[in-house]
Amino acid sequence: MEGDCLSCMKYLMFVFNFFVFLGGACLLGVGIWVLVDPTGFREIVATNPLLTTGAYIVLAMGGLLFLLGFLGCCGAVRENRCLLLFFFLFILIIFLVELSAAILAFIFREHLTREFFTKELTKHYQGDNDTDVFSATWNSVMITFGCCGVNGPEDFKLASVFRLLTLDTEEVPKACCRREPQTRDGVVLSREECQLGRNPFINKQGCYTVILNTFETYVYLAGAFAIGVLAIELFLMVFAMCLFRGIQ
C-alpha cells in the first residue's frame, strides 16, 4: 500500500513538473525572441527601458521555471534523493520569497494612495525623457490608458522638474494628448490644442481612477491566483519530502 502511494505521488509530481518545464521553455522562447528578433521588434524594445526590463524578467522567470520543472521531473523519475532534496530547497526558497512579498504588499498597501503617487509624480516626472525609467513608465501608462497625471492635467502645474525642463512652455506632456490610434507611435491629434486643454484633444481623466477601475476585479483574481500558487508549492514540497523519505 505504501509503495502504491509513493508511486502515485511520483507520477503526479512528474506530470505537474512536466507542465512547469514546458511553461518555462515557452517563456524562455518568448524572452529570447523579443531580445534577438531580426524583424525590428528588438529595436522597438531597446528604445524603451520598461520593455527591456520586462523582457529580462520574462527570461528570468522562464529560466527559473525551466530549471524547477527539470529538477522535479528528473528527481521523480530517477528517484534521486539528491535531486529531490535540491528541488525541495528550491521550492522552499521560492515559497518564502513569495510569502514575504505578499506580507510586505499587505503591510505597505496603504502607502499606495492617490497622495503618494501625486507626490512622486510632481517630484520626479521629466516629461518625454525615455531614458528615465520613472518618466518612461508614466508615459506608457498615460498613453495605454488614455489618462493624464494622477488626478488630471492639473498635476503638471506642480511638477517642478517637468516645468523646469520644458521652461514652462508646456502645460502637459505629450503623453497626455489624445492619439489616433492610442499607441506610443500613434499620431497626436493636435499638440497645440492639447496644450490649451481643449476637448477632444487632451485626456482629462486622472490615471489613478482609470487604473483602479480597470484592475479592481483583477486584484481579487491575482490574490486568489497567488494563494493557489502557494498552495501548489506547499503540496509539491510535501510530495518531494515524502518521496525523499520513501526512497531507500
From Swiss-Prot:
Ranges annotated as spanning the membrane: 14-34, 50-70, 84-104, 224-244
Protein location: Membrane
Extracellular face of the membrane: 35-49, 105-223
GO biological processes: calcium-ion regulated exocytosis; establishment of localization in cell; hemostasis; inflammatory response; protein localization to cell periphery; regulation of sprouting angiogenesis; regulation of store-operated calcium entry
Pfam families: Tetraspanin
Reported tissue expression: Highly expressed in lung. Expressed in adult heart, artery and vein.
Phenotype reported upon loss of the gene: Homozygote knockout mice lacking Tspan18 are viables.
Superkingdom of this protein's organism: Eukaryota
Keywords assigned: Glycoprotein, Membrane, Transmembrane, Transmembrane helix
UniProt-annotated glycosylation sites, renumbered to this chain: 129
GO molecular function: transmembrane transporter binding
Cytoplasmic side stretches: 1-13, 71-83, 245-248
A cellular-component GO term for this protein: cell periphery
Main location: membrane
Keyword Repeat annotated: no
SUPFAM superfamilies noted in UniProt: Tetraspanin
Membrane topology: Multi-pass membrane protein
Family listed: Belongs to the tetraspanin (TM4SF) family.
Quaternary organization: Interacts with ORAI1; this interaction regulates ORAI1 exit from the endoplasmic (ER), and/or Golgi, and trafficking to the cell surface.
Function statement: Plays a role in the cell surface localization of ORAI1 and may participate in the regulation of Ca(2+) signaling and the VWF release in response to inflammatory stimuli.
Protein name: Tetraspanin-18
The organism of origin for this protein: Mus musculus (Mouse)
